[in-house]
Amino acid sequence: MTLANKLTLSRIVMVPVVIAVYYLPFSFSGVLAAVLFVIASLTDLLDGAIARKRGEVTSFGKFADPIADKLLVAAMLLPLCGDGKIHAAIVFAIIAREFIVSGIRLVAVSSKTNSVISASWLGKIKTVIQIVAITVILLGNWPFSLINFPMDQILIWLMLTITIWSGADYLIKYWGIIGETK
């Protein structure tokens, strides 16, 4: 197994750790969860860079990397929703998009072309915005709360917008593959 794939798997392993820390009964659990969430998110940058630098880009990595991102993001959206920090309809829309895009990827792999769909530039921007938004929410909108600026709310709406946009982009680009399954 390549180092890049190990980093991807480590991101998946960190998901329950970040959630457990978020629920710890002390005042700085959100901050600690944010730190762990950022560390887990940074493995997303590292795994791709390492795979490309070493010439170790694999089909597993192309498929597992976006799944690891989705797990990390969805796993944090749910408790934030449960705590009333993000509206349930927004979380539903984001998670629904992730299932739809994952479904498109599965169909592409099982199609006649046996295609592995890598993350698009728009999908990568979406992931970065989701990570930034979740981090700011975990930090209680700090440092923006010091100047009474609702950055968390702005990021939530930006996250929803880019998520829907990138989902529509995948649907438009890969709609033809859906009819080509074996």
Task: Give the ranges of each region predicted by the language model.
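Alpha-helical transmembrane bundles and membrane-interface segments of multipass inner-membrane proteins
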Residues: 1-182
